[in-house]
Amino acid sequence: SEVWISSVQPYNAYGYQFGWEQMQQMQDMGLFLRGVKTKLKDNGDDYYGIIRESTSRSIPSAIIEHCHVDESRDTPYCQTEEDWKKFGREDALSVAKYFGLSSASLGVDYSGEADALPEVSLQSILPATVRDKTEPDICQLTLQNADYETGEVSLEVTAADYDCPMMYYDYSTDGGRTYSELLPWPGLDIMAGTYPDTFTFSVTFTKGEQPVITVRGYNQADLFTESDPEIG
């Protein structure tokens, strides 16, 4: 899940606060969060027309991408009409919480929710919403253990991006010719902007095989840096 917002203040700040609330609802559903972001054209204007034109009319706006239908981890959330309706209800709940609405007839009171929104500045674009244009600064792979009886290799990944969070990783066992599916970065908290810069994972191989393993670390902008290979 991700939310696209305007790069223009104060709509950038309004959008970030709404997107933050929306991300809480999507997280509660179990979806993987990709954050609240801006996307710009080459001339610096907002890329998406609905956002650009809304801002020009002084109307706050946001585009919500609930999930990707071609992503295997997302498809369980968007298969039926009831799934789609649930997204709509969660969107409405995000709006109600953002504005701090209450209803005696419905028995709900979100008047305190608005006070829990993250603090923002109306003077400049929020750094967390700026799309990074460079690859991660570091991506290193270290062989921890190779058990040739069981065919299991344990590896340590160390990676960092000094401009935005790490988002995914994938790995290759054939020296980079083919790669696994993208895997979520372990321990990532995209809304806090935090992630562990080191984690371990294991791969299995056929007995007698000597894999050549590489890892790619991806940042929030989907740009990657590839590690040097390790021979298992």
Language model feature labels by segment:
Residues 15-44:
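Active-site-adjacent substrate-binding region
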